Amino acid sequence: MKKLFFVTNVDWFFISHRLPIALNAIQQGYEVYLLSRDTGRKQFLQGKGIRFIDIPFDRSGSNPLHELKCIFQLYTNYKKYRPNIIHHVTLKAALLGSVAAKLSGQHHVVNAISGLGYNFTNGRNGILQKLIRTLIRIAFKSKSFSFILQNPDDVGMIKGFNLVPSSHIFLIKGSGVDLNEFVFSQAPGKTQLKVLFPARILLDKGVMEFIDAAKLLQKRFIGKVKFILAGDCDKENLAVLGEEKLRSLLVDDYIEWIGYQAQMFPIYTDSDIVVLPSYREGLPKSLIEACAVGRPIVTTDVPGCRECVKSGYNGYLVPAKDSRALADAIGLLIEDDAKRKEFGRNS
């Protein structure tokens, strides 16, 4: 039986972004493995027929010795099982996994990078960026590896490294959503509108800009609008806004945090406007879901986000890190019921 390896930093990301593909591969006769860090989903995945190999990825990536340990564990498993296809998902898994694949003589490798990341491309932290670029040149240079990127900016950047043939670089816009689950629905039409931030509570997702924009609009709309944050405080992410700090910024019956939601469809259907002021993305699943459900969107004019919105057609694009522009765009949609419905239909 052919073996297909999925390799990603953490099991919950695999469930949200790759599980349907894995289940389809099983139906086609593949023996599917997930090599990832177990955060409590191992038994669930094994129940789906997926073989689980625990690799202790550290998402903060601050210990080089730990990264070498992960490479060695990947190498050992690649040598032991000799998979027919290795599918690395996320930048870190692709970097470490590609080194392990080269060392073990594996050639059928697909690196799916959902976003190169704001910290890698923002022009700051030059030493870290130089290190990552060096690692990319070492890990990814191969005539046999293939790459899947989610937006044209990332495609251009990977092509600029000149590491693999251009014919091995593919643009697939996003990880997709199940349209049987995320179906178009009319906005709730309640007296109190809801503005939704559907993302982890991270600074580079624009969480502070969302909260700042809400507070700029507070005098005009308190009692008429509620701003909802639906996402986890990802404590392992260096860009996390801590839970204590977040709670200090909430406003009763105006800015509310509902935490991680396993089922997002009812959250979208109960919302009127979706907002993601991120600094950079691959192509955010949350915005694809919002489009599928038929919600107007306010997001930033940055790689990944701009691919989901045609400004003035299904939402508005605003500059990153601009709370005032964000507030103005949200305010336009709050005040214009007809525009919200039009943009929602166009999504």
For each feature predicted by the language model, list its residue ranges.
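Glycosyltransferase donor-sugar binding loop
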Residues: S36-G40, P198, K226-L241
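Short hydrophobic beta-strand element within catalytic cores of glycosyltransferases
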Residues: P296-T299, V309
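Membrane-proximal helix-turn-helix segments that form the acceptor-binding/catalytic region
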Residues: I21-Q28, F72-Y75, Q129-I148
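Aromatic "clamp/platform" in nucleotide-sugar-dependent glycosyltransferases that forms part
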Residues: Y260, Y279
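Conserved donor-binding/catalytic core segment of Leloir-type glycosyltransferases
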Residues: Q186-K205, F210-K215, F227-I228
